[in-house]
């Protein structure tokens, strides 16, 4: 991953911390950037794991969307975050192919997954 991208991802994680605070458990980069086969037009796939219920997560949806939009505009990126309950992710990681893939190829940017 290019050094400039690493710096931008660190800033994005800092913004995620501001939104979720102590509820944030992990931020995982997955997809083409984690595998190293990205192109100039690749999106940046981010999994956010939090210590919140699905209902509680909904309260943060707009804030995450607004922050991500502003971040993408500022850095000319296409960050695509998915926020999930850490409990849900851990429960289903061995059963859901998508979660398995995130766990297998993911690069931990913050916390522990």
Regions from the language model: what does each represent?
Residues 25-33:
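Short gly/ser-rich loop at a beta-strand->alpha-helix junction or flexible surface loop bordering the NTP-binding
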């Amino acid at each position: 991953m290019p050094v400039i991208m690493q710096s931008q991802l660190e800033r994005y994680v800092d913004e995620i911390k501001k939104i979720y605070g102590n509820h944030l458990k992990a931020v995982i980069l997955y997809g083409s950037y984690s595998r190293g086969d990205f192109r100039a037009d690749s999106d940046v796939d981010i999994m956010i794991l939090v210590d919140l219920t699905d209902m509680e997560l909904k309260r943060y949806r707009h804030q995450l969307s607004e922050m991500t939009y502003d971040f993408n505009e500022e850095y000319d990126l296409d960050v695509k975050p998915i926020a999930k309950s850490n409990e849900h992710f851990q429960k289903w990681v061995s059963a859901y192919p998508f979660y398995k893939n995130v766990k297998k190829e993911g690069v931990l940017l913050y916390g522990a997954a």
